Amino acid sequence: MHTHRVTQQDLNEAGAMAAVPTLLQQCIPRGTDIRVTIIGDAVFPVEIITPPDAPVDWRATRKGLRYRLCAIPAETERNCRSLLAALGLVYGAFDFIRTDSGDWYFLEVNPAGEWAWLDIELGLPMRDALIDLLYGNHQSA
């Protein structure tokens, strides 16, 4: 299941949505999708550059996607680490949207989110971070 825009027709047929788990949120203006993966002590923030005709949810198709490392605000990293600590986790894949005006929107954290394709695409040391985590060579997120 991927994110998609809810139409007026969807709302008119809202009874159908009652049969399945549904999460609704305000539509956030498209900006830059950012995946921040935290593995133990290591933080890997990556911009996901989508083509103009990409679906709302970049995960629906990876056709035409490009990736690059990016910086994230220190407060955002602290908040991610605080959330992991509160949840008792040492791994999390955080998804954000950064609007063109520079506002950051937190979408979700996935405690089992995918990461390997970014390790391969960008040559990141994510596997090494996971090995360190599994062997106990880390502090806590």
Model-derived regions: residue spans:
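Short solvent-exposed loop/turn micro-motifs enriched in small/polar/acidic residues
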Residues: I28-G31, T76, L89-Y91
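A conserved acidic, glycine/proline-rich C-terminal tail/linker
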Residues: C80-L84
